[in-house]
Amino acid sequence: MNKDTIFSAPIEKLGDFTFDESVAEVFPDMIQRSVPGYSNIITAIGMLAQRFVTEGSQVYDLGCSRGAGILSIRRNLQTNQVKIIGVDNSQPMVERCRSHINAYHSEVPVEILCDDIRHIEIKNASMVVLNFTLQFLPRADRLELLTKIYQGLNPNGILVLSEKFTFENQVMNELLIDLHHTFKRANGYSELEVSQKRTALENVMLTDSIETHKDRLKQAGFSQIELWFQCFNFGSMIAVK
């Protein structure tokens, strides 16, 4: 696993964070050291696939990055009669995802598309995953995407929505942000790395509160919604049609 050192030296002109070649190269290390509970979420996505994915249906991983979620799903399926569709708009991520998926033999077909997730038709889906993806979309586009997902899910289909959260109570919000930064420092990131990455992300990752997410999911059509995992200001929700 290549180590993330992208923000380790001072960057004079710090632009917005993008999922480019340099990020794709170190992404597994970056996300493990940056997102508390990430491996637990990936493992649980496989468990949820085992329970919810049905024969003859499709599974979508929207914002699939290098394919960790897809591999977890595929390992846990009860049937081979399923198609998994992964979508990411970063070509470097897609290339590595395809290579990663092809390294493990399976009878389950997987298609990896380089596209904007807002352009993808969702149909005959028993499971859709948005793993730390929605927060990178403009807020104005989020409800439309979730509504499309709801409409494309079969009855009893599941959406897994993992996000970084903001909290309306400012004291708690600052505490959880600080704990997250402590987590990153404990994983070997310097103050400079934490600071520069935060600055690079502030215009492209727009976080919402848990309440906002629940309200939006209800507007999209879901009625069964629950937060099933949280560590500091990161977590994951499930919504069942």
Swiss-Prot record:
Q: Which GO terms describe its biological process?
A: tRNA wobble uridine modification
Enumerate the residues binding S-adenosyl-L-methionine.
38, 63-65, 88-89, 116-117, 131, 198
Report the superkingdom from the record: Bacteria
Against Pfam families, the record matches this protein to: Methyltransf_25
* GO function term, MF aspect, one: carboxyl- or carbamoyltransferase activity
| Main function | Catalyzes the conversion of S-adenosyl-L-methionine (SAM) to carboxy-S-adenosyl-L-methionine (Cx-SAM).
Q: How does it assemble?
A: Homodimer.
What family is reported? Belongs to the class I-like SAM-binding methyltransferase superfamily. Cx-SAM synthase family.
Which named protein is this?
Answer: Carboxy-S-adenosyl-L-methionine synthase
Enzyme Commission identifier(s): 2.1.3.-
Signal peptide positions are none
Q: According to its UniProt record, which reaction does this protein catalyse?
A: prephenate + S-adenosyl-L-methionine = carboxy-S-adenosyl-L-methionine + 3-phenylpyruvate + H2O
The keyword Transferase is assigned to this record: yes
Keyword annotations of the record: S-adenosyl-L-methionine, Transferase
Q: Which InterPro entries match?
A: CmoA, Methyltransf_25, SAM-dependent_MTases_sf
What gene does the UniProt entry assign to this protein? cmoA
